[in-house]
Amino acid sequence: MVEAPGSAPRILMLVGGPGNGKTEAIESTIGWLDGALGASDRLVQALAGAFLPAGDGFVPRLVRVDAGALGSPGRQLAISIVQDASTVLDATGRPAAQLLLDELEAMQSAPETEAYLCCVNRGVLDDALIEAIDRGSGCSRELLEAVTRAVSLAPDAPSCWPLDSFPAVAAWPMDAESLLLPPARGGEAPAKSLVRHALEESRWLPAGSCAAGPSCPFCGSRERLARDRDEGSLLRMLRWYEVASGKRWSFRDLFSLVSYLLAGHRVSPRDAGLEPCGWAARLAGLDETANRGGKPSRETSSSIFQLVAAQYQHALFHRWDRDAGPSLLRDIKELGLDDDNTAMGLYWFLSSRRAPYLPSMIGDVLEGLGELLDPALAAPDAEVQASRNTRFALREVDIRFSRSVLEGLDYLRKLQILTRLEVELIGRLARLDGELSSPGVRRRRPLSATNLQRFIRDFACRLVRRSLGTRTATVLDAPILSDFQRVIEDGEGEGLYEIAHEVEQLLNRNQDFEISLTTTFGQPLPPLSRRAMLVVPARSVRPLQANASGRPASPIPFLKVGDGRSSQPIALTYDLFKAVRELEEGMSVASLPRTVLALLDTTRARLAGPIVRDGQLLERARIQVGSPDTSVVQRRVGFGIRKDGATR
């Protein structure tokens, strides 16, 4: 762009949602251009002044600078930058899509010394395409269609840098690449750099100066995440969330998540002004009152629960049975334990979860993370590497906590793998559990005592599972997630062949592929006697190699179903991969989740249309009417009926 105008794309579009780093990419590009021009920061300063006007001025939508005149030596190069294409300031009421279309039309006819950098979300891009169609702007419509295809996740998406038919235009999908993977050119994963930056010791209070002392959950989280194992497990779980959900962590999401894990989220307006360590110190003081046997209150009794919940492992997996509060309180009162700080603290803690308590920015993401990965739901046979020389199955923890909280605590205490706050809370729960086992308490209400005791043991066991699972990445379906991640990140696609074979068996029945002729997509099949099925030879399923030239690697692997014109691509989703793995372990096909059944039905429906129009394929087809023993087949002249292998 600087040394040889016309040799590189000059219309650059960064496409993606908010928080994906589009603005930062523009800033880096300007820095590189400034250096290439020999502008000595004059280009950076000129743009900074335009995008950061003095006083109450508004940030303009488009800023144009004569970059060539600022360089040394001077040359012809003008740069126009749209930092946010959804902005409509000073547009006299015109929508953002019209402004974007006007800018693209102007830039296409501009000389090679004019460059255009634009950050745009997919919604504005689609609206601009609709506007181009309405205007009848053929060239602009073709350009926007090419951009839309190039930044899509389709397996046949063409090159986006540059566009195939528009060498002067380049686009890049900013939401396609994972921040948890190292860049293709080498270096550290952005998410890893972000976490390590937040954990730098120089950015925290000196050791021993925290107002909360050893009771501070945030300083404790920082200390644990500074260890390679804990940090690696956190990043691995965040990556597993991506591969399972199909979503990507944006920069904005990661910044919010790290802030939430290391500084907490305070809901009460009274606590909003407190520093994280100050908030922890206040709760630690309140807990001292409860621990000395003070009168139970919502603040004092639940303090230890809130401190434990603020540790990163419990902030990440935060879900508790929020609806258990009323029945829990009833059992507590029937047993006369409403003066017990631990029992009432448990009730008040669960009740607090009925109100919103997560940061609104990442609340939905945290809910999805807990649903997909919660270590409390991991298989009992899953093994935890607690230390270098100690490894055990979660079943060992479950068995001990099912007998008593104290037995579970004694088993884990000697391994020194729980935090001080966790040991303190579980110790109090163990004392309450022991009290519920005493004849004096059980005699009053044996059923209430049993219910409360079961709940306490389950609570303690879940707490321990989350602590162990988060620090070792022993989460729900961890082996399947690890295998799926390996398949996705395998550049050669070797792991896809085995999966393709299993999907082929799911789509076909024995050696046949069946298409219903009496129903449309989504309708249930009629009774067997009223069915008419077109039966063709089985459709093959093979890995589909996505185009990787001039574009980011596809975040989703695809399979190719069928041959020739009737072939169709299907996405290998986590649900489909998991279903295949579970079928290998003996699960019945009837137990497949609805999402997988819908994907298979959709694939059959998409294949059906081209198949019924493929004359060559229909030569080997037959129609089953009613019983599978009766088929209509094509003969040299007309059709015949075939029954049990005989022809009539």
Descriptions of predicted regions:
Residues M1-G6, V15, T23-S233:
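Extended charged low-complexity segments that act as oligomerization/scaffolding linkers
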Residues P9:
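Short coil/loop residues immediately preceding or within conserved phosphate-binding loops
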Residues L12:
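Conserved beta-strand position immediately N-terminal to the Walker
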Residues G19:
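Walker A (P-loop) phosphate-binding loop of P-loop NTPases
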Residues A25-S28, A605-R648:
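Hydrophobic, glycine-enriched assembly/anchoring segments
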Residues D34, L101, E105-Q108, V124, ...:
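Alpha-helical repeat scaffolds in large eukaryotic proteins
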Residues E188, K192-T518:
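Extended alpha-helical coiled-coil/bundle linker/stalk regions that scaffold oligomerization
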Residues R428, R462, R466, Q523-V625:
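C-terminal structured domain segments
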